[in-house]
Amino acid sequence: MPLPRLLSTALLCLAATLAHGADLQPLKVANQKSTIKALLQVSGELEHVPYTIDFSEFPAAAPLGEALNAGAVDVGALGDAPYVFALGAGAPLKVVSITHMNGRYTTALLVPQDSPIQQVGDLKGKRIVTTKGSIGHLLVIKALHEAGLKTSDVTFAFLLPSESRVVLENGSVDAWSTWDPYTTVATASGQERVLVSGATLLTNHLYLAATSQAIADKRVQLQDFVARVDRAWQWANGHPREYAAAMAKVTGLPLEIQLAAAQNTHMERVPIDAQVIKGLQQTADLYRSEGILTKPVDVSHGFDPSFNASTPLAASAQ
């Protein structure tokens, strides 16, 4: 093809790309304590985005799931355990991306350093604090079952992480089930120790879940957003200090705590496949058997594998 014609074709393609980007609707992203926004900012993935991203802040996964259910946001990140609750509430959601969190204390059941509790079996008759419907809640259930105990053998107190450590340290409860960076904060202080880690008991998956309406109306934006988040996590794996500094600013936690958490955690995207769906179904069935869910939940409708091959729009627009 002659050079003038080649340049003309390239300019037409670029114009079409820019025009398409101008027509794209804003993507409404649920942001849990600024974590996704901070990740995308520090990794450079909020640059050259051919559509607007509107972030909304939520203090925890439960209200984030409620916002998704209500259609107030298009997409948000939450753990597999709270996602089951969202599906159980009838939320028209689908997982569009899954990131595996491989870390030393990504989730853990903690007890005071001087506690006489040495194994999970010692928790019988004790009080455990966690956040209801959280990954910490799921860890307690699985740990108790593995030790031959029932959830009725303990007493639960359901609080947010910011309140949970206070009641553990003042002796109101005997154990706390939580996740990073709270696990790192607690163990670094020397006041708490890990009774059991969720590394072998849980999948430790982080879901990006989108509403069915957003998938229908904003698929192009969602595919691009999924790819950006994936690239951002890959960047964070290789730049733990920079990532930790960004997270310290938004969480208010000391830099050394965030750095320890970042250095001990590796994020890796995994495909949406039959094995993942089976694992979540087992979690849903466990919640049903515990009476936490009032009716059976078929989780197979809550995934969209077509997003497995998502690539960023910016790669072609730049």
Task: Place the predicted regions along the sequence by residue.
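Extracytoplasmic/secreted envelope proteins and their assembly/folding machinery
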Residues: 37, 65, 69, 80-83, ...
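Hydrophobic h-region of N-terminal signal peptides that target proteins for export
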Residues: 12-21
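Conserved C-terminal helix/tail region of periplasmic/extracytoplasmic solute-binding proteins
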Residues: 288-318
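Short, glycine-/small- and polar/acidic-enriched structural segments
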Residues: 22-150, 156-158, 174-177, 193, ...
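Secondary-structure end/capping motifs
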Residues: 217-294
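Pocket-lining segment of extracytoplasmic ligand-binding domains
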Residues: 81, 156-157, 162-249
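Structured segments of extracytoplasmic/periplasmic soluble domains
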Residues: 42-43, 67, 71, 75, ...
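Bacterial N-terminal signal peptides that target proteins for export
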Residues: 1-8
